[in-house]
């Protein structure tokens, strides 16, 4: 079997495993009619189950988890990616509408548990495994393939009760977000910032206060513009990094 065919099969296998677990976590709470804190805890438990199984497999198969991207960042990478400031601003921006404290500490803990699990699982599979598999074929190809799959995986939000229109917007946003995370992963050599920033973004979205539809549209537009500009910057610096290697061939 050719190397490329093996990469395609591994990509398909990784997607199948991830989608099965994510479909299960959404379907369980919808079918059982579970909401609120219990819903977040159950969904989080299913996702963390996937994370633990994946980490255990990596430890047994590869004697560690560095194969998945859990390693130190390259020297100077944090400065080159502007200390992640654009992503931090995007993640924290929903708090302009306030914080939902009606559920108390249990609500915050349950959502932290859930969003850390989501961040771990999605970054391990989309960046650590899928993007990692395709990096040998070029950063551009790895970025596009992993990001397109990441974007369309959000169709499973429908299983969790999300509306179709909202899901389509999430897919578009996730597509660009995925490209940004892929470039950060390629530039830094580490999955850790992707996991933490992903989890922070989801957590802030889940626990932020409610705002008017007009404000959410405005905020979403601003977030998208900031994200797009950041993507163009990251693409430029990674392209510069690749130029010497291309000339040396």
Predicted regions located by residue number:
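N-terminal, membrane-interfacial amphipathic/helix-forming hydrophobic leader that caps
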Residues: 1-65, 179, 203-249
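Hydrophobic alpha-helical transmembrane segments
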Residues: 8-16, 78-85, 108-112, 140-145, ...
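Aromatic-anchored segments of alpha-helical transmembrane domains
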Residues: 18-26, 88-97, 115, 147-157, ...
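Juxtamembrane helix-loop-helix connectors linking adjacent transmembrane helices
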Residues: 30-44, 59-124, 131, 135-136, ...
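Membrane-embedded alpha-helical segments of multi-pass membrane proteins
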Residues: 45-53, 105-113, 121, 168-176, ...
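Generic transmembrane alpha-helix motif of multi-pass integral membrane proteins
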Residues: 53-57, 117, 129-130, 176-189
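Membrane-interface helix/loop boundary segments of multi-pass membrane proteins
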Residues: 121-147, 186-190
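Functionally important transmembrane alpha-helices
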Residues: 167-223
């Amino acid at each position: 079997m050719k190397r490329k065919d093996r990469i395609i099969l591994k990509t398909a296998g990784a997607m199948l495993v991830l989608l099965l677990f994510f479909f299960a976590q959404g379907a369980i709470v919808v079918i059982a009619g579970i909401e609120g804190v219990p819903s977040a805890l159950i969904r989080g438990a299913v996702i963390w189950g996937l994370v633990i199984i994946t980490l255990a497999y990596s430890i047994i198969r590869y004697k560690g988890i560095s194969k998945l991207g859990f390693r130190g960042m390259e020297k100077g990478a944090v400065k080159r990616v502007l200390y992640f400031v654009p992503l931090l601003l995007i993640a924290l921006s929903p708090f302009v509408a306030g914080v939902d404290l009606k559920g108390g500490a249990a609500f915050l803990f349950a959502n932290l548990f859930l969003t850390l699990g989501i961040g771990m699982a999605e970054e391990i599979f989309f960046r650590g495994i899928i993007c990692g598999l395709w990096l040998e074929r070029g950063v551009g190809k790895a970025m596009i393939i992993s990001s397109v799959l990441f974007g369309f995986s959000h169709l499973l939000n429908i299983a969790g009760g999300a509306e179709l229109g909202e899901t389509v917007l999430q897919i578009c946003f996730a597509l660009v977000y995925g490209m940004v995370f892929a470039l950060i992963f390629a530039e830094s050599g580490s999955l850790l910032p992707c996991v933490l920033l992903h989890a922070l973004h989801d957590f802030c979205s889940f626990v932020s206060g409610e705002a008017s539809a007009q404000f959410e549209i405005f905020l979403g537009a601003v977030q998208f513009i900031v994200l797009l500009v950041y993507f163009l910057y990251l693409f430029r610096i990674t392209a510069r990094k690749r130029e010497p290697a291309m000339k040396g061939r």
